[in-house]
Swiss-Prot record:
Transmembrane segments: none annotated. Keywords: ATP-binding, Cytoplasm, Ligase, Nucleotide-binding, Purine biosynthesis. This is Phosphoribosylformylglycinamidine cyclo-ligase. The keyword Glycoprotein does not apply. InterPro entries: PurM-like_C_dom, PurM-like_C_sf, PurM-like_N, PurM-like_N_sf, PurM_cligase. It comes from Escherichia coli (strain UTI89 / UPEC).
Length: 345
């Protein structure tokens, strides 16, 4: 009989002990996100969550997203602590535009070789994003897949479920001629346009860690976590008649605003109402990017746009700014049968 080496899962590149160590490391931060509706803890086959009792006719709203190639930049710069906030933001901001309160969040973390410190930093960021948005991190999947990813490269995806009263769903159907558009300032490029960002860095030969912009490294501007608008917007919805909300993500102004406009309406954006944050001026100049392409790729300093009746504007601005948002009037809605749904002038 020929002697053969006894193989283990670890020999194949999967370290179960590292996975267990990660769970032990993150339990504390995950527990801080717990809502009263959540039943059980980490480790079950499925997460249980009751619906909040305040809803008479609750409708569940779900969303899933990633952070695109911003993740590649974060890995290249070895900055993993805020990418989890980005992941949560991309999901919960999509939910709140429909009036939904985020309830719970799950994440998927996949890597070729699990580094407990890196994964812990990412998941701690996810927990922070959940705290900022008031939802519970109820579970996730950490997949160590040798041969699928290069070295310690990783990818993340997020999944969120929220709830809204059926009669209070915001779907844009109430938008009408004369409505005013309010902008909520962004924290930077958020999590969109990073393939172009990375191309600009490559072509310009710029090192984002040594290049200074507004007194801090360019890397700080590019990796600033996506702003989470949930709590401010939910309070606004309670107190103001909001007709529509657009989350400015991939596709920028041209593609996201029309998603919430009824037929025969047009959004007219006043370009003079705000100054682009310096990072967008740098990207446009360094990449020689045309204005139309900037508005199609980046948020250019505007993370959300809210449509509401003109008499509600002052109240809405006061509420939003009191909650720490940078909010201003950015445009109006007018009746139009033009195929151009958004005009920036």
């Amino acid at each position: 009989m020929t002697d053969k080496t006894s193989l283990s899962y670890k020999d194949a590149g999967v370290d179960i002990d590292a996975g267990n160590a990660l769970v032990g490391r993150i339990k504390g931060v995950v527990k801080k996100t717990r809502r009263p509706e959540v039943m059980g803890g980490l480790g079950g086959f499925g997460a249980l969550c009751a619906l909040p009792q305040k809803y008479r006719e609750p409708v569940l709203v779900s969303g899933t997203d990633g952070v695109g190639t911003k993740l590649r930049l974060a890995m290249d710069l070895k900055r993993h602590d805020t990418i989890g906030i980005d992941l949560v933001a991309m999901c919960v901001n999509d939910l709140v535009v429909q009036g939904a309160e985020p309830l719970f969040f799950l994440d998927y973390y996949a890597t070729g070789k699990l580094d407990v410190n890196t994964a812990s930093a990412v998941i701690s960021g996810i927990a922070e994003g959940c705290l900022q948005s008031g939802c519970s991190l109820v579970g996730g999947e950490t997949a160590e897949m040798p041969g699928m990813y290069h070295g310690e490269d990783y990818d993340v995806a997020g999944f969120c479920v929220g709830v809204v009263e059926k009669s209070e769903i915001i779907d844009g159907s109430k938008v009408s001629d004369g409505d005013v558009l309010i902008a909520l300032g962004s924290s930077g490029p958020h999590s969109n346009g990073y393939s172009l960002v990375r191309k600009i860095l490559e072509v310009s030969g710029c090192d984002p860690q040594t290049t200074e912009l507004d007194g801090k490294p360019l890397a700080d501007h590019l990796l600033a976590p996506t702003r989470i608008y949930v709590k401010s917007v939910l309070e606004l919805i309670e107190k103001v008649d909001v007709h529509a909300i657009a989350h400015l993500t991939g596709g920028g102004f041209w593609e996201n605003i029309p998603r919430v406009l009824p037929d025969n309406t047009q959004a007219v954006i006043d370009e003079s109402s705000w100054q682009w944050p310096e990072v967008f001026n740098w990207l446009q100049t360094a990449g020689n990017v045309e204005r139309h392409e900037m508005y199609r790729t980046f948020n250019c300093g505007v993370g959300m746009i809210i449509a509401l009746p003109a008499p509600e504007v002052d109240k809405a601005l006061a509420l939003l700014n009191a909650n720490g948002e940078n909010a201003w009037k950015i445009g109006i809605i007018k009746t139009s049968d033009s195929e151009q749904r958004v005009v920036i002038e």
